[in-house]
């Protein structure tokens, strides 16, 4: 409010009025931030953030000193893509040697600008592509940047105190880059081995050095103050042996750069097991490292055993609705579960066939020798279809047997199917326990006639009998069987006899060739319920179908 305003001047205008409304706030109006307990989520997050920034407390704990001014040598391995070093040089004013080998640095600027007293710097295999920012280390005397991707040496001209420079395994390919090192008056030792400039003076398509090229003599001319070149005194200017850029040499160079062979177990900032930065004691043993397999370094090489799981794509039918974002469930989940259950019940028995599961492709098999000895061409085709490895489900066999009975009865309606069975010869066989249990488990709900879910047997043996009238008899085979009521009896007698005939034919088809096909007739088995295996008693619940008025 305006302090010069008083009541003698009248009421204030409405536009200048101030209204204050008190809210029904039960707590303090201006509460102070609460200090979270140690171990809470926020405190952990704050400590992690402090660790990433290398706070003074963190440096004291890692260097195991109370006074950071006593730290002169520090060795650590960092990844600046995940952790920020900040301006940690402010807390280490007397740091002289810093070793960051095997780290990842996007640029030298990640080290800050407060390391002006640093004299020795190791940056081997740090993924550096340039030396921008090296000018902030004005007192640097030794620089080791081997096995990086450095090709430009111009930033080094600012280092007047530089004495030792290691450029082994970099990408220096132009001899003119050596002119920048002329501005380093104290440079005495230089390592250039592993650079293209050692093979040819300038970049070009050829991998061979020009005739008479001697890089040692050329470097000595450009850097006269140099004393040692590639660990050999510069007074020895004899031409080295001719060298060529071989594929093996390039592969070894790149492998060293990537750190796949000579990786040492240095602690990292993101190490969850404790100290992430520490000062190494030279007397402590360094743990040996297990080198990677050579196949991991060579492109296209085989992977070592155990690296991949034996069955990475195992299908789990109990959770195929939750396979991640690759499969989206739309609509009613209840209907989806029912559909999945029906599909699994339909295909699971076929997948559980142990010997021949990989070979699920349907192939026509060869009939057994001498098929002419069989009196029934349809049974010959059925035996060829039920070869081991291609045998379909028991339900498929039951449907085929019922269809065959309907075809024969359609040709001679006055003939009893049991008498036809007597003429063709009785067939008995022992049923494996697995088939009996499978029949007893599935016969309660698989006896509804439906189109077959699998291809029919090959047409070589039954084309003249079954294929001409396949579709008409498929839809009304049970009705034709129901029309046989007067000849077979009424009520439960018909159901028992039909069940016995169907069971015997199914057992014959599932166990291979019959005795009659091999020329050995067997005595006629009993057709009563006692003769059937225990797993087949549920077949007696079949009720006869009322006879049709007329045959189609």
UniProtKB/Swiss-Prot annotation:
How does the record describe its quaternary structure? Interacts with IFT88.
Extract one GO BP annotation from the record. cell projection organization
Q: Which InterPro entries does the entry link to?
A: Leu-rich_rpt, Leu-rich_rpt_4, LRR_dom_sf, LRRC56
The record's function comment reads:
Required for the assembly of dynein arms.
Protein name, UniProt field: Leucine-rich repeat-containing protein 56
Q: Which cysteines does the record link by disulfide bonds? A: none
Its localization reads:
Cell projection, Cilium
The GO cellular component terms are: cilium
Tell me the domain of life: Eukaryota
Family of this protein:
Belongs to the LRRC56 family.
Keywords from the UniProt entry: Cell projection, Cilium, Cilium biogenesis/degradation, Leucine-rich repeat, Repeat
Annotated organism of origin: Mus musculus (Mouse)
Region (Disordered) residue spans: 348-375, 401-435
LRR repeat feature ranges: 94-115, 117-138, 139-160, 161-182, 186-206
């Amino acid at each position: 409010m305006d302090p010069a305003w008083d009541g003698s001047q009248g009421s204030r205008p409405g536009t200048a009025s101030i209204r204050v409304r008190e809210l029904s706030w039960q707590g303090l109006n201006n509460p102070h931030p609460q200090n979270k307990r140690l171990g809470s989520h926020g405190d952990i997050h704050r400590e992690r953030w402090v660790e990433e920034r290398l706070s003074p407390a963190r440096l004291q704990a890692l260097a195991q000193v109370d006074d950071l001014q006593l730290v002169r040598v520090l060795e650590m391995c960092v990844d600046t893509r995940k952790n920020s070093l900040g301006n940690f040089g402010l807390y280490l004013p007397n740091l002289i040697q810093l070793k960051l080998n095997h780290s990842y640095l996007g640029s030298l600027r990640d080290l800050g600008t407060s390391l002006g007293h640093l004299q020795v710097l190791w940056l081997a295999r740090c993924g550096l592509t340039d030396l921008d920012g090296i000018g902030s280390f004005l007192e640097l005397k030794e620089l080791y940047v081997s096995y990086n991707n450095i090709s430009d040496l111009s930033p080094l001209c600012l280092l007047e105190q530089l004495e030792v420079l290691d450029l082994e395994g970099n990408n220096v390919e132009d001899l003119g880059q050596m002119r920048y090192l002329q501005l380093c008056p104290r440079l005495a030792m230089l390592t250039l081995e592993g650079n293209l400039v050692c093979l040819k003076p300038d970049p070009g398509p050829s991998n061979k050095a020009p005739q008479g090229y001697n890089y040692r003599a050329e470097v000595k001319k450009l850097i006269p103050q140099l004393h040692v070149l590639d660990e050999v005194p510069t007074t020895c200017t004899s031409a080295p042996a001719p060298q060529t850029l071989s594929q093996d040499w390039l592969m070894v160079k790149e492998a060293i750069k990537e750190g796949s062979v000579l990786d040492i177990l240095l602690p990292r900032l993101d190490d969850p097991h404790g100290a992430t930065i520490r000062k190494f004691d030279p007397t402590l043993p360094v743990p040996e490292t297990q080198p990677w397999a050579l196949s991991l370094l060579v492109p296209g090489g085989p992977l070592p055993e155990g690296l991949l799981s034996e069955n990475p794509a195992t299908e789990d039918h109990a959770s195929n609705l939750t396979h991640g974002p690759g499969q989206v469930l739309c609509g009613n989940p209840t209907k989806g579960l029912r559909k999945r259950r029906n599909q699994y019940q339909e295909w699971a028995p076929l997948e559980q066939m142990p010997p021949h599961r990989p070979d699920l492709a349907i192939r026509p098999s060869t009939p057994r020798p001498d098929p002419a000895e069989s009196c029934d061409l349809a049974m010959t085709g059925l035996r060829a279809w039920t070869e081991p490895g291609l045998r379909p489900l028991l339900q498929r066999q039951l449907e085929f047997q019922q269809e065959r009975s309907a075809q024969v009865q359609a040709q001679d309606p006055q003939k009893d199917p049991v008498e036809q069975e007597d003429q063709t010869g009785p067939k008995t066989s022992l049923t494996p326990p697995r088939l009996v249990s499978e029949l007893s488990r599935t016969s309660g709900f698989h006896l509804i006639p439906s189109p077959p879910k699998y291809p029919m047997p090959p047409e070589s043996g039954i084309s003249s009998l079954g294929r001409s009238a396949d579709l008409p008899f498929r839809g009304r085979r049970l009705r034709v069987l129901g029309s046989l009521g007067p000849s077979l009896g009424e009520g439960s007698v018909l159901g028992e006899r039909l069940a016995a005939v169907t069971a015997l034919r199914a057992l014959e088809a599932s166990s291979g060739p019959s005795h009659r096909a091999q020329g050995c007739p067997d005595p006629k088995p009993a057709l009563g319920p006692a003769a059937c295996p225990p797993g087949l008693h549920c077949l007696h619940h079949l009720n006869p179908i009322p006879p049709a008025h007329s045959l189609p």
